[in-house]
């Protein structure tokens, strides 16, 4: 029987000033702001959150004791990034 993982939070850390927007699966905007270098935001983990960022290379995502720091290049706009763990793990393996 598969083990159900309980993930309680997701943290987005800025290593450079980065605009981010996070929507839920109803397209409701939960966060839309610039996070300043060396700051972070913590969100309760919900399935099907979507991230848009204006600086993919400027953010690091922390989830389930994993670090995803290769979403894209500095200054690169990325849309529709699923924050589901199984999607983010693909970035770790690249």
Question: Which ranges hold each PLM region?
Answer:
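Long, low-complexity, acidic/serine-threonine-proline-glutamine-glycine-rich intrinsically disordered tracts
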Residues: 1-24, 28, 82-94
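Generic structural motif recognizing short loop/turn segments at the entrances and edges of beta-strands
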Residues: 6-8, 31, 39, 74-79
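Structural recognition of beta-strand segments within beta-rich domains
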Residues: 12-16, 20-45, 50-54, 59-63, ...
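Contiguous beta-sheet cores, especially beta-hairpins with glycine/small-residue-rich turns
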Residues: 65-89
């Amino acid at each position: 029987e598969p083990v159900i993982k309980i993930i309680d939070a997701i943290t987005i850390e800025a290593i450079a000033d980065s605009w981010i927007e996070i929507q839920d699966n109803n397209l409701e905007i939960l966060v839309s702001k610039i996070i300043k270098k060396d700051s972070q935001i913590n969100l309760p983990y919900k399935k099907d959150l979507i991230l848009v960022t204006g600086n993919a290379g400027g953010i690091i995502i922390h989830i389930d004791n994993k670090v995803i720091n290769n979403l894209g290049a500095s200054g690169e706009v990325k849309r529709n990034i699923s924050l589901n763990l199984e999607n983010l793990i693909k970035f770790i393996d690249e």
